[in-house]
Amino acid sequence: MQRSPLEKASVVSKLFFSWTRPILKKGYRQRLELSDIYQIPSADSADNLSEILEREWDRELASKKNPKLINALRRCFFWRFMFYGILLYLGEVTKAVQPLLLGRIIASYDPDNKVERSIAIYLGIGLCLLFILRTLLLHPAIFGLHHIGMQMRIAMFSLIYKKTLKLSSRVLDKISIGQLVSLLSNNLNKFDEGLALAHFVWIAPLQVTLLMGLLWELLQASAFYGLAALIVVALLQAFLGRMMMKYRDQRAGKINERLVITSEIIENIQSVKAYCWEEAMEQMIENLRKTELKLTQKAAYVRYVNSSGFFASGFFVVLFSVLPYLLNEGIILRKIFTTISFCIVLRMAVTRQFPWAVQTWYDSIGAINKIQDFLQKQEFKTLEYNLTTTEVVMENVTAFWDEGFGELFENAKQNSKNRNISNSDNSLFFSNFSLLGTPVLRDINFQIERGQLLAIAGSTGAGKTSLLMMLLGELEPSEGKIKHSGRISFCSQFSWIMPGTIKENIIFGVCYDEYRYRSVIKACQLEEDISKFAEKDNVVLGEGGLTLSGGQRARICLARAVYKDADLYLLDSPFGHLDVLTEKQIFESCVCKLMANKTRILVTSKMEHLKKADKILILHEGSSYFYGTFSELQNLRPDFHSKLMGYDSFDQFSAERRNSILTETLRRFSLEGDAAIPWNETKKQSFKQTGEFGEKRKNSILNPINSAKKFSVVQKTPLQMNGIEEDSEEPSERRLSLVPDSEQGEAILPRSNVINTGPTFQKRRRQSVLNLMTHSSVNQCQIIHQKTAPSTRKMSLAPQGDLAEMDIYSRRLSQGSGLEISEEINEEDLKECFFDDMESIPTVTTWNTYLRYVTAHKSLSFVLIWCLVLFLAEVAAFLVLLWHFKEKPPQDRGNSTGSTNSSNAFIVTNTSHFYLFYIYVGVADSLFALGFIRGLPLVHSLITVSKILHHKMLHSVLHAPMSTLNMLKAGEILNRFSKDTAILDDLLPLTIFDFIQLALIVIGAIAVVSVLQPYIFLATVPVITAFITLRAYFLPTSQQLKQLESEGRSPIFTHLVTSLRGLWTLRAFGRQPYFEALFHKALNLHTANWFLYLSTLRWFQMRIEMIFVIFFIAVTFISILTTGEGEGRVGIILTLAMNIMSTLQWAMNSSIDVDSLMRSVSRVFKFIDMPTEESKSTKLIKPSKDDKLTKVMIIENQHVKKDDLWPLGGQMTIKNLIAKYTDNGNAILENISFSISPGQRVGLLGRTGSGKSTLLSALLRLLNTEGEIQIDGVSWDSVTLQQWRKAFGVIPQKVFIFSGTFRKNLDPYEQWNDEEIWKVADEVGLRSVIEQFPGKLDFVLLDGGFVLSHGHKQLLCLARSVLSKAKILLLDEPSAHLDPITYQIIRRTLKQAFADCTVILSEHRIEAMLECQQFLVIEENKVRQYDSLQKLLSEKILFQQAMSPLDRLKLLPHRNSSRHKSQSKISALKEETEEEVQETRL
């Protein structure tokens, strides 16, 4: 960054913002880079501001029982705030004085008062000086207030972040990431945007008082009629605003539903294409969009009437002010024109400034109170340790995740017994109190000496991670003692990668030791991975390590923990993402050898690990099931294996979570997805499992919880909240374990708003910061907002301060028209936080974009022409009125009822002034009617254009090739459908309307002034030229600075989320100061862009006013010097000239707003222009109902006869297959060749990242591929994509359950009747599951099907494949995270329903390969071997090395006959699973 010219700028340069000229010049000539931005002043640095506020806040905490954050802010910023407030008031006073001088100038032209004619020139000079003074006062004041608001935001940003790093885990469990981001963005933005308006809460009343005093002198009591009219207008606007909000609130549900479906589709676009569901998904979204747009139009119409009413109110305010006076006294032009000027200022004060100021204070005080509450939350306390000890000891330790719940639970339980409270929904708190009061750990005892290895095992939710958290100090024990030596290193089971290089992630601030570093890299099997990067270990890892596989991230996290020299190493399931061979090597070389002399606590369930551990601790439901050695375990606890069954299924998380933050944040927790539910309701729907069901599932691994329970699906829809609130209803749903339910969320336990009441162990997944920390996701930074079930808040898709608002009035109006989309957090802020990226879009919107936008709908061009015609009609009507005022009618002095006093001279007779009054009312009504007719079709047409563009963009995205979509982030795509679509729906139509309205007013006013005084036209031409030139000069720099500011905002929130994800690791390593410094650096970067934008913005505003002042000086002296007799003409000219100033500024602001908003249109067009997948068929052929493809599909294939049915057998031939993710990318698979016989089952083998899943994608033509693939002799390039993909049934690794009914998820095209669907549900064992839900097939699944276990989701995918009648089945690790029972069900279904199908199976589990006849071994992106099981076992390859002797014994029956499964085994399998298939757990 460059040094700021502000440091050496003179006072004059600072006053006129001339020091910004270098950056403006550079931005106009070339694209700005980050290096071009100026450094911030030291007074604005985050370190300085946070230190000042933190000192005052600490002082407040120390001195008072009830500390107030506003007092700390007052001591920091009050005097500067008041100084700029006084400047602002003085600037506003000049606006009230100007009409007085105008009245004196008009009076000097009274033919009966020629004495004052000589002073008109001096009055004109005074009027011009007032404009100059106003400019010099207002702009520094507004800039200073914006600057103070920025400083307040920075200081509180830092304070909140520091507090976040100190919060206890108990508090983090109650706060969602959405609330935190909202606290930082939505609440704190109020200071940036609203502080300049805050002073009007006292300025506006003083202004109104002054103006009413001046109007009283002119009109006497008649002035109050005008004030009453303004108050009525303000109340009417408030009423229309409430009506508009009602429509937007109704629309919020539809928008959320659409965004949920859209986000699910974007995240699972590969599955959508594999299932050929593009058209079904498109139709589903369009149906939601249709209803949404109806409500959008209603809200837009009300908003339009509101805006039109403001523009038209000026006529009627003057009318009500002048009419009573006119009836009594007659028309006096001097008073009329003076009154008009006063009313314009009065209108702004009453209808804009004061209401906005009150709202600003209300919002700001609310935001400060929320931040104040947050800053007083409980903090994390480091566990005390003993440096003299060498052992780790726990004695009688009991712990609750909720502080003080032990005592509270005992008291409540005793009260419950005494009162005999029933277990019903009406007493939900007490019926679930066993859930709340159950300790996460109970009476834990163990002791390990230095250098020993303790293995902790147990089923999901047993308390393994909680035990490690106790050692870290994250969980405080309620009872017992903990002792350790103090130096701890920690490896979380949820891989956390901070932004930086691989080396920085491993060293993590510890002193660099080359030998130790290399040893750790080698022991963690990272040498080969690092060697593949061109930059080796200096390669930069962005956004949570998106470029790494899950296994690579896990190994880097393990290396980080091992590299630190500590006394105690806590390793929480570090091998979850690793293949069998890599896991075996790391355990031996790293855990057993490199760390042999260190004390280690390892969470694991592998039998091999337990055998080598010095001590074993098995936890069950929070209690110690066993503690001792492995030999003691075998002797004393022979049934221990039952406590571990299913552990692998649920404790290891895949790299890509189905329920990623991106999808979870947009969830609506309702049962009815098609209705917008009032926010103050709580909707419940309960259903009870039968006793028979519970008995059958009682001992199932799928359901370790006793199953005879009552479930209550709760839709919480409380009132609006704007921050972090304590939920009074929340105790009914508490989390008891840090361990999430399952990989796909929900394998065992209900989640979110599903309350599971059981006698022994219950919990729910909280969407909290704690949950964020325990959720591993590749897309960890692709967060829009985390939905909070019990709390909701307002959010706007209108960019907050993003529309290049050029003054505080028009800026507030633009925000007032923003889209209120949901009652949660500010979605727009979140989206901009995480998804704004460098765009290949011009700095200024091109004319081609405007042309494409205008021609997108044929009626829009005609509407624009219609607007122009009506404008000409309005100008003509206005000229009629002016003609009557301009020409003085004949006067009958004898019949005149008025006085001939010079100060009250009448221009017309008593008869004619009523005639003029009728003309005035008629013209005003006509202008209002014409304006209404003009604007309404325009707004309607623009919304229709938005509908068309959204449809085209959705179609383009769904049909774009994966090579194109792989280049885009999911958040970037979703931004187009959320932020940009909202701009097209709401802001752009009304901003265009405002701009057209204002531009026409300015043009009309200039035309009228030029008609009245042609000489003024000569001054108008250069002024308009100067305005256009100035705008063209400023706009490129403005847009680029806004883009840089937006990009600078992203690291702030990305760093926040990154810190929260790794908070346990940060604390364990003591890296909080380092991350605070990084956060301040990100804040300073954003501040540099924002401060420069504010400065250039004020430079532009001052130049606009300076140009206008020159224009007004010219108009004033031309009219004074050239106008003869007739005060009417001078009054009209000067009044219109004064009004042109504010209107022209507003019009210029709107023009820049339009250009800024049109960038969203450019982004939408960029997506519309994406290439589409190759397809010879333009018409979608839906799946047929029988066991074949329709004849229409095969006619297009020249290689298939019309009477043939393809595919028949499922024979596949692959020759020289090469696959790439992008057109110009490196080959992911090279020269893959093999063949599969009809009905054969092929297993894909290879270590993590070898290309197994890539091969399955290539077979579906989801990647850029070269080579040849044939199915039954038909080549893949001779059929359409739809034909080809329908030949496959798919069970993807990433399970796709979209928000919709069971029926929609199974049959989105509605091709099958209920009988056929139930038949398939029976085959896969889903009938009993579906029947447990109200509505059965019509039950709406939300949140990725959170009420289903991961196993049931797999069965749902299996049912889709059965319905598709596919001849080839592709399975990508279908057994991952499955319990044994569900896995056996899937195996049975595959054997029965797909007995004659070709199956290609990718698996890590050895036992999952028992049914395969051939195996394809992939190494280094190539085929290593393609052979039968016998040959694979007889040769020394990785497959054999990865197997334990036990695995080999399992495969012995298959060495002699790999084609046929032993009938005895089949019979045993049937007997084992028959009962489980019939009844499966809900």
Swiss-Prot record:
Database matches in PROSITE patterns: ABC_TM1F (PS50929), ABC_TRANSPORTER_1 (PS00211), ABC_TRANSPORTER_2 (PS50893)
CDD domains linked: ABC_6TM_CFTR_D1, ABC_6TM_CFTR_D2, ABCC_CFTR1
Phosphoserine: residues bearing it: S549, S660, S670, S686, S700, S712, S737, S768, S791, S796, S814, S1458
Record-linked InterPro entries: AAA+_ATPase (IPR003593), ABC1_TM_dom (IPR011527), ABC1_TM_sf (IPR036640), ABC_transporter-like_ATP-bd (IPR003439), ABC_transporter-like_CS (IPR017871), ABC_transporter_C-like (IPR050173), CFTR/ABCC7 (IPR009147), CFTR1_ATP-bd_dom1 (IPR047082)
GO biological process, one term: multicellular organismal-level water homeostasis
Domain ABC transporter: 423-646, 1212-1445
Keyword Ion transport: yes
ABC transmembrane type-1 domain ranges (all copies): 81-365, 860-1156
Keywords of the record: ATP-binding, Cell membrane, Chloride, Chloride channel, Endoplasmic reticulum, Endosome, Glycoprotein, Ion channel, Ion transport, Isomerase, Isopeptide bond, Lipoprotein, Membrane, Nucleotide-binding, Nucleus, Palmitate, Phosphoprotein, Repeat, Transmembrane, Transmembrane helix, Transport, Ubl conjugation
Residue numbers of Phosphothreonine PTMs: T717
Catalytic reaction equation(s): ATP + H2O + closed Cl(-) channel = ADP + phosphate + open Cl(-) channel; chloride(in) = chloride(out); hydrogencarbonate(in) = hydrogencarbonate(out); ATP + H2O = ADP + phosphate + H(+)
UniProt topological domain (Extracellular) ranges: 99-122, 217-222, 320-339, 881-919, 1013-1014, 1118-1131
Subcellular location: Apical cell membrane; Early endosome membrane; Cell membrane; Recycling endosome membrane
Function: Epithelial ion channel that plays an important role in the regulation of epithelial ion and water transport and fluid homeostasis. Mediates the transport of chloride ions across the cell membrane. Possesses an intrinsic ATPase activity and utilizes ATP to gate its channel; the passive flow of anions through the channel is gated by cycles of ATP binding and hydrolysis by the ATP-binding domains. The ion channel is also permeable to HCO(3)(-); selectivity depends on the extracellular chloride concentration.
Oligomer and partners: Monomer; does not require oligomerization for channel activity. May form oligomers in the membrane. Interacts with SLC26A3, SLC26A6 and NHERF1. Interacts with SHANK2. Interacts with MYO6. Interacts (via C-terminus) with GOPC (via PDZ domain); this promotes CFTR internalization and thereby decreases channel activity. Interacts with SLC4A7 through NHERF1. Found in a complex with MYO5B and RAB11A. Interacts with ANO1. Interacts with SLC26A8. Interacts with AHCYL1; the interaction increases CFTR activity. Interacts with CSE1L.
Entry remark concerning the domains of this protein: Binds and hydrolyzes ATP via the two cytoplasmic ABC transporter nucleotide-binding domains. The two ATP-binding domains interact with each other, forming a head-to-tail dimer. Normal ATPase activity requires interaction between the two domains. The first ABC transporter nucleotide-binding domain has no ATPase activity by itself.
Protein name: Cystic fibrosis transmembrane conductance regulator
Biological source species: Carollia perspicillata (Seba's short-tailed bat)
Lineage: Eukaryota, Metazoa, Chordata, Craniata, Vertebrata
Originating gene: CFTR
